[in-house]
Amino acid sequence: MLLKLITTIFLLTCITLFGMVGCSLIERMLLFYPTHRPNNSSLTPWIRNGEIIGYSRKVESPENVWLMLHGNAGQASDRLYAVPCFSGDDSVFILEYPGYGNREGVPSKESFNRAAQEAYLFLRETYPRTPVCVVAESIGSGPASSLASLTNKPDKFVLIVPFDRLSLVAEEHFPSILIRLILKGNWDNVKALSNFKGLIEIFGAKEDTVIPVRHAKALAATVPGSKLVIIDGGHNDWSYEGRVEIRNP
Protein backbone atom coordinates (compact mmCIF):
# COMPACT_ATOMS: atom_id res chain seq x y z
CA MET A 1 0.00 0.00 0.00
CA LEU A 2 2.80 2.42 0.90
CA LEU A 3 4.58 1.68 -2.39
CA LYS A 4 1.37 2.38 -4.33
CA LEU A 5 0.92 5.66 -2.47
CA ILE A 6 4.50 6.74 -3.17
CA THR A 7 4.15 5.79 -6.84
CA THR A 8 0.87 7.70 -7.14
CA ILE A 9 2.36 10.82 -5.54
CA PHE A 10 5.40 10.55 -7.82
CA LEU A 11 3.26 10.27 -10.95
CA LEU A 12 1.01 13.16 -9.91
CA THR A 13 4.09 15.27 -9.29
CA CYS A 14 5.45 14.38 -12.73
CA ILE A 15 2.14 15.21 -14.41
CA THR A 16 2.17 18.59 -12.66
CA LEU A 17 5.72 19.18 -13.85
CA PHE A 18 4.72 18.27 -17.41
CA GLY A 19 2.14 21.04 -17.31
CA MET A 20 4.59 23.52 -15.83
CA VAL A 21 7.73 23.03 -17.86
CA GLY A 22 6.89 20.60 -20.66
CA CYS A 23 8.05 17.10 -21.53
CA SER A 24 11.00 18.21 -23.66
CA LEU A 25 12.61 20.12 -20.81
CA ILE A 26 12.12 17.22 -18.39
CA GLU A 27 13.63 14.85 -20.96
CA ARG A 28 16.69 17.10 -21.24
CA MET A 29 17.00 17.25 -17.46
CA LEU A 30 16.97 13.45 -17.22
CA LEU A 31 19.19 12.62 -20.21
CA PHE A 32 21.77 15.35 -20.68
CA TYR A 33 24.38 16.60 -18.21
CA PRO A 34 26.60 19.08 -20.06
CA THR A 35 29.44 21.06 -18.55
CA HIS A 36 30.83 24.34 -19.87
CA ARG A 37 34.44 24.53 -18.77
CA PRO A 38 37.37 25.93 -20.79
CA ASN A 39 39.61 23.40 -22.50
CA ASN A 40 42.58 22.77 -20.22
CA SER A 41 43.69 19.59 -21.97
CA SER A 42 46.31 19.02 -24.65
CA LEU A 43 43.59 18.35 -27.22
CA THR A 44 43.47 20.74 -30.18
CA PRO A 45 40.27 22.61 -31.08
CA TRP A 46 38.54 21.10 -34.11
CA ILE A 47 37.14 23.93 -36.21
CA ARG A 48 34.55 23.93 -38.99
CA ASN A 49 33.33 27.15 -40.61
CA GLY A 50 34.91 29.18 -37.84
CA GLU A 51 33.16 27.25 -35.05
CA ILE A 52 34.77 24.87 -32.58
CA ILE A 53 32.84 21.62 -33.05
CA GLY A 54 35.10 19.45 -30.92
CA TYR A 55 38.67 18.58 -30.03
CA SER A 56 41.28 16.43 -31.72
CA ARG A 57 44.55 14.54 -31.58
CA LYS A 58 45.86 14.73 -35.15
CA VAL A 59 48.83 12.95 -36.70
CA GLU A 60 50.46 13.43 -40.09
CA SER A 61 49.17 11.06 -42.79
CA PRO A 62 46.91 9.03 -40.48
CA GLU A 63 46.21 5.40 -41.25
CA ASN A 64 42.65 5.88 -39.97
CA VAL A 65 40.49 8.79 -38.88
CA TRP A 66 38.14 8.30 -35.94
CA LEU A 67 35.07 10.32 -35.06
CA MET A 68 34.35 9.89 -31.34
CA LEU A 69 30.91 10.54 -29.85
CA HIS A 70 31.11 10.80 -26.07
CA GLY A 71 28.60 10.09 -23.31
CA ASN A 72 25.85 12.29 -21.92
CA ALA A 73 27.88 13.98 -19.17
CA GLY A 74 30.75 16.45 -19.33
CA GLN A 75 32.12 17.76 -22.62
CA ALA A 76 34.43 16.75 -25.46
CA SER A 77 37.60 18.26 -24.00
CA ASP A 78 37.21 15.96 -20.97
CA ARG A 79 37.88 12.92 -23.15
CA LEU A 80 41.67 13.12 -23.21
CA TYR A 81 41.60 9.89 -21.20
CA ALA A 82 40.34 8.03 -24.27
CA VAL A 83 43.23 8.98 -26.56
CA PRO A 84 45.66 6.25 -25.34
CA CYS A 85 43.09 3.65 -26.45
CA PHE A 86 43.74 4.59 -30.10
CA SER A 87 46.70 3.71 -32.29
CA GLY A 88 49.36 6.41 -32.41
CA ASP A 89 49.07 6.23 -36.20
CA ASP A 90 45.42 7.33 -36.20
CA SER A 91 43.83 10.77 -35.88
CA VAL A 92 41.01 11.22 -33.38
CA PHE A 93 38.26 13.86 -33.53
CA ILE A 94 35.97 14.13 -30.50
CA LEU A 95 32.67 15.81 -31.33
CA GLU A 96 31.20 18.44 -29.04
CA TYR A 97 27.43 18.16 -28.83
CA PRO A 98 25.12 21.17 -29.21
CA GLY A 99 24.64 22.73 -25.79
CA TYR A 100 27.82 21.17 -24.39
CA GLY A 101 31.10 22.91 -23.65
CA ASN A 102 31.11 26.24 -25.47
CA ARG A 103 29.01 25.02 -28.38
CA GLU A 104 25.68 26.71 -28.91
CA GLY A 105 22.46 24.78 -29.28
CA VAL A 106 20.06 22.61 -27.31
CA PRO A 107 20.75 18.94 -26.52
CA SER A 108 18.29 16.53 -28.13
CA LYS A 109 18.21 13.40 -30.23
CA GLU A 110 17.75 15.47 -33.36
CA SER A 111 20.55 17.93 -32.62
CA PHE A 112 22.96 15.12 -31.66
CA ASN A 113 22.19 13.15 -34.83
CA ARG A 114 22.53 16.23 -37.02
CA ALA A 115 25.83 17.25 -35.42
CA ALA A 116 27.18 13.71 -35.79
CA GLN A 117 26.25 13.56 -39.47
CA GLU A 118 27.73 16.98 -40.24
CA ALA A 119 30.97 16.11 -38.44
CA TYR A 120 31.24 12.73 -40.13
CA LEU A 121 30.70 14.15 -43.61
CA PHE A 122 33.21 16.92 -42.84
CA LEU A 123 35.83 14.27 -42.01
CA ARG A 124 35.01 12.39 -45.21
CA GLU A 125 35.53 15.60 -47.14
CA THR A 126 38.77 16.39 -45.31
CA TYR A 127 40.22 12.87 -45.61
CA PRO A 128 38.80 11.50 -48.89
CA ARG A 129 41.34 8.67 -49.20
CA THR A 130 41.56 7.61 -45.55
CA PRO A 131 39.24 5.19 -43.71
CA VAL A 132 36.84 7.11 -41.48
CA CYS A 133 35.60 5.10 -38.51
CA VAL A 134 33.23 5.90 -35.65
CA VAL A 135 33.65 5.14 -31.95
CA ALA A 136 31.01 5.96 -29.35
CA GLU A 137 30.51 5.54 -25.64
CA SER A 138 27.21 5.21 -23.81
CA ILE A 139 24.52 7.57 -25.17
CA GLY A 140 26.88 8.44 -28.02
CA SER A 141 26.07 5.03 -29.49
CA GLY A 142 22.70 6.51 -30.51
CA PRO A 143 23.89 9.27 -32.84
CA ALA A 144 26.76 7.02 -33.93
CA SER A 145 24.40 4.27 -35.06
CA SER A 146 22.33 6.80 -37.00
CA LEU A 147 25.31 7.21 -39.35
CA ALA A 148 24.69 3.70 -40.67
CA SER A 149 21.85 5.17 -42.76
CA LEU A 150 24.22 7.31 -44.84
CA THR A 151 25.19 6.35 -48.37
CA ASN A 152 28.90 6.64 -47.59
CA LYS A 153 28.95 4.60 -44.41
CA PRO A 154 31.67 4.46 -41.74
CA ASP A 155 34.43 1.94 -42.35
CA LYS A 156 33.98 0.58 -38.83
CA PHE A 157 31.91 1.12 -35.69
CA VAL A 158 33.24 0.61 -32.17
CA LEU A 159 30.45 0.91 -29.60
CA ILE A 160 31.50 1.00 -25.95
CA VAL A 161 28.97 0.33 -23.13
CA PRO A 162 26.12 0.93 -25.60
CA PHE A 163 22.39 0.31 -25.37
CA ASP A 164 20.14 -1.62 -27.71
CA ARG A 165 17.13 0.68 -27.26
CA LEU A 166 17.37 3.72 -25.00
CA SER A 167 13.82 3.27 -23.72
CA LEU A 168 14.66 -0.18 -22.36
CA VAL A 169 17.52 1.26 -20.32
CA ALA A 170 15.44 4.21 -19.12
CA GLU A 171 12.72 1.88 -17.87
CA GLU A 172 15.25 0.26 -15.54
CA HIS A 173 15.77 3.59 -13.78
CA PHE A 174 12.34 5.26 -13.98
CA PRO A 175 8.68 4.12 -14.07
CA SER A 176 7.61 2.89 -17.52
CA ILE A 177 4.66 5.26 -17.69
CA LEU A 178 6.97 8.22 -17.10
CA ILE A 179 9.30 7.08 -19.89
CA ARG A 180 6.42 6.68 -22.33
CA LEU A 181 5.25 10.20 -21.52
CA ILE A 182 8.52 12.09 -21.81
CA LEU A 183 11.04 10.09 -23.86
CA LYS A 184 10.81 11.54 -27.34
CA GLY A 185 14.47 10.96 -28.22
CA ASN A 186 14.31 7.18 -28.14
CA TRP A 187 17.37 6.01 -30.03
CA ASP A 188 16.93 2.48 -31.36
CA ASN A 189 20.37 1.10 -32.19
CA VAL A 190 18.97 -2.30 -33.16
CA LYS A 191 16.91 -0.74 -35.93
CA ALA A 192 19.62 1.74 -36.98
CA LEU A 193 22.25 -0.97 -37.45
CA SER A 194 19.98 -3.68 -38.85
CA ASN A 195 21.17 -3.27 -42.45
CA PHE A 196 24.80 -2.35 -41.80
CA LYS A 197 27.16 -4.93 -43.33
CA GLY A 198 30.51 -3.50 -42.21
CA LEU A 199 32.69 -4.03 -39.16
CA ILE A 200 31.11 -3.51 -35.73
CA GLU A 201 32.87 -4.12 -32.42
CA ILE A 202 30.80 -3.91 -29.23
CA PHE A 203 32.23 -3.63 -25.71
CA GLY A 204 30.08 -4.32 -22.66
CA ALA A 205 31.22 -3.89 -19.05
CA LYS A 206 30.49 -6.66 -16.54
CA GLU A 207 29.73 -4.39 -13.58
CA ASP A 208 27.91 -1.66 -15.50
CA THR A 209 24.94 -0.41 -13.47
CA VAL A 210 24.10 2.51 -15.78
CA ILE A 211 23.62 0.50 -18.98
CA PRO A 212 23.78 -3.12 -17.79
CA VAL A 213 25.86 -5.45 -19.93
CA ARG A 214 22.78 -7.33 -21.13
CA HIS A 215 22.02 -4.38 -23.43
CA ALA A 216 25.39 -4.70 -25.18
CA LYS A 217 24.77 -8.44 -25.50
CA ALA A 218 21.28 -7.87 -26.89
CA LEU A 219 22.60 -5.39 -29.43
CA ALA A 220 25.36 -7.74 -30.56
CA ALA A 221 22.88 -10.59 -30.90
CA THR A 222 20.77 -8.59 -33.35
CA VAL A 223 23.59 -7.22 -35.51
CA PRO A 224 24.96 -9.90 -37.86
CA GLY A 225 28.73 -10.11 -37.95
CA SER A 226 29.33 -7.91 -34.92
CA LYS A 227 32.06 -8.81 -32.45
CA LEU A 228 31.15 -8.71 -28.75
CA VAL A 229 33.84 -8.19 -26.10
CA ILE A 230 33.01 -8.24 -22.38
CA ILE A 231 35.40 -6.26 -20.20
CA ASP A 232 35.85 -5.86 -16.45
CA GLY A 233 34.65 -2.82 -14.57
CA GLY A 234 31.72 -0.46 -14.58
CA HIS A 235 30.25 2.04 -16.99
CA ASN A 236 33.05 4.59 -16.77
CA ASP A 237 35.97 2.19 -16.38
CA TRP A 238 36.45 1.12 -20.00
CA SER A 239 39.54 3.26 -20.66
CA TYR A 240 41.46 1.83 -17.68
CA GLU A 241 44.34 -0.64 -17.95
CA GLY A 242 44.09 -1.11 -21.69
CA ARG A 243 40.69 -2.80 -21.46
CA VAL A 244 39.63 -1.36 -24.82
CA GLU A 245 41.89 -1.00 -27.85
CA ILE A 246 40.28 1.01 -30.63
CA ARG A 247 41.65 -0.22 -33.91
CA ASN A 248 40.78 -0.66 -37.58
CA PRO A 249 40.71 -3.37 -38.69
Residue ranges with predicted function:
Residues 9-56:
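An N-terminal hydrophobic leader/cap segment in hydrolases
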Residues 53-122, 142:
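Membrane-embedded segments
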Residues 135-140, 144:
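Gly/Ala-rich beta-loop-alpha elbow adjacent to hydrolase catalytic centers
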Residues 158-168, 188-189, 233:
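Active-site nucleophile loop of the alpha/beta-hydrolase fold
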Residues 196-197, 201-204, 208:
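Short beta-strand/loop motif that positions the catalytic acidic residue
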Residues 209-215:
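Conserved alpha/beta-hydrolase "acid-adjacent" motif
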Residues 234-244:
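Catalytic histidine-centered segment of alpha/beta-hydrolase-like enzymes
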